[in-house]
Amino acid sequence: MRKTFDVIVVGGGHAGCEAAAASARLGAETALLTHRFATVGAMSCNPAIGGLGKGHLVREIDALDGLMGRMADTGGIQFRVLNRRKGPAVRGPRAQIDRALYAAAMQAEIRATPHLSVIEGEADALVLKDDRIAGLKLADGREFSCRAVVITTGTFLRGIIHLGETSWPAGRINEAPAMGLSKSFEQIGFTLGRLKTGTPARLDGTTIDWAAVERQPGDDPAEPFSTLTEEITTPQVECGITRTTTATHAVIRENVHRSPLYSGQIQSIGPRYCPSIEDKIVRFGDRDSHQIFLEPEGLKDTTVYPNGISTSLPEEVQKAILTTIPGLERTRMIRPGYAIEYDHVDPRELEPTLETRRVPGLFLAGQINGTTGYEEAAAQGLVAGLNAARTAGGKEGVIFDRADGYLGVMIDDLTSRGVTEPYRMFTSRAEYRLTLRADNADQRLTWRGLALGVVGFARQAQFDAKMRALDAAKEAAKSLSLTPTEGIRHGLALNRDGQRRSAFELLAYPEIGWADVARIWPQLAEVTPDIAEHVEIDAKYDVYLARQAADVSAFRRDEALVLSGVDYADVPGLSNEARQKLQKAQPRTIGQAARIEAMTPAALGILTAYLRRRSRHRSDAKAG
């Protein structure tokens, strides 16, 4: 085993796998350090990938030739597009995943990746030289040299599991936590916080009364995550839906004092949008019931994940809860649910490249940055791995901004605003939703991945072919036109204004689809359904996209006003509160400063004027 690498990635979860693979795709000699290779690609909580906002991230990861989308297509056992009846901007692709198939596919991919080695062991301490990363020391005494390190420790940093009145150190059920790295971070000067997440019990699906619950099938045909997947070939399954009852709520209320969340045993904050069932009952006391999705964990695994009843109540209380839920009255509980607390670093310590400001060459990704969710972790991992490889090669880091994609929105939110609770991606967080759709992730990002060298030949060939087909279809739709009289003859409701309208312009009408224009111009029927859908979406959003492009231009102008080297004490007119906020956050640009909580327009105006004066003075000095 070699002792020197360009990049070492710590952790084999979703962030770690994407980081290691991205680094290796750029040609950096990369090591993935994990406790046990058998746990690489493990899905610690729910057996699903994607969803609202999250599905956008998976598509963006795929557009940059990441792994998650392809692995999900391999292991997916039910695919659904959420919000399908709404506009394309807020639709969310999602899939139930066979845990075993997903992990096996991920492990095979990691093993087959050139320039990527796997080391089994526990990271104990960061090794610095001249205040920058120089290597990593393991708990067993081994030491490896490198130019960059990516930390993706998930819930393992000083992790503690809570189950009723009992708690014990763990990073995941039956797995030891990582203790040394937290000490290393504190010694360097990082401020660590604590966050909490939880998971529900696991149930024996053979003991569920499936006749008593609603059945939920997937979409047919299934829509893959990856543009490289031609069709889903894995057998598909149904999920079940049931609900809590007033009897369920009574059991929880009688025992809520035994929950670590309410006994004072847990002090840290959990995810707002994924609360435990006891939290739901306390916070939403007027609700008679809460929905539970019964999600199969695999084709050859009878385990079922009851999505919606995450809890850390004592095991016997969890069993009592199950007896009150329709379809689960006689269900055998395989494993109780639990909560887990873990360390995280304030993400405002990071540059938008995910490199730490304190230690050059040190990158963080995933739950260590205060996020929750596989997709959020994976997207950060890809960006961190990409930039770690560039740093190791002596190149500048790459920034994805809020107009580039949801991954840019997330990273900007984290590095500008920090977190007070686990951060989850939603479509509502993005200002440019019409532009940042799940269906056009490759059009937005693959060209950039090609320029960076992170996209391989197979995706390049597929992308080039798709763009040629898309351009040809759009050109054809714009070149074919008719008069209002001709349109009315074809059954279209058009104004008799004498204006010719192209097929592309007709597609902007809400009631006109590709099938309608293809009936008028039969040559359009030759366009494949996926390309036709892209053109139709572009046509329907055309006017709005033009307006949003102007907004993006204004945003980019603000992002171009760089604040590096500004001493806020020297900026006249700033209030003390604004100075303190700016000094603490250290925003990189005016745009980032604008996103600091409670930053006033007046303060931003003063800053902008100061920057312009400074720029003029520097220009005058150079001219002189």
From Swiss-Prot:
Annotated residues for binding of FAD: 11-16
Cofactor: FAD
One Gene Ontology term, aspect cellular component: cytosol
PROSITE patterns noted in UniProt: GIDA_1 (PS01280), GIDA_2 (PS01281)
Binding site residues for NAD(+): 270-284
Major subcellular location class: cytoplasm
Subcellular location: Cytoplasm
GO BP annotations listed: tRNA methylation; tRNA wobble uridine modification
One Gene Ontology molecular-function label: flavin adenine dinucleotide binding
Keywords recorded for this protein, A-Z: Cytoplasm, FAD, Flavoprotein, NAD, tRNA processing
Membrane-spanning residues: none
InterPro entries membership: FAD/NAD-bd_sf (IPR036188), GIDA_C_N (IPR049312), MnmG (IPR004416), MnmG-rel (IPR002218), MnmG-rel_CS (IPR020595), MnmG_C (IPR026904), MnmG_C_subdom (IPR047001), MnmG_C_subdom_sf (IPR044920)
Reported function: NAD-binding protein involved in the addition of a carboxymethylaminomethyl (cmnm) group at the wobble position (U34) of certain tRNAs, forming tRNA-cmnm(5)s(2)U34.
HAMAP family in the record: MnmG_GidA
Subunit structure: Homodimer. Heterotetramer of two MnmE and two MnmG subunits.
Entry's family note: Belongs to the MnmG family.
Protein name, as recorded: tRNA uridine 5-carboxymethylaminomethyl modification enzyme MnmG
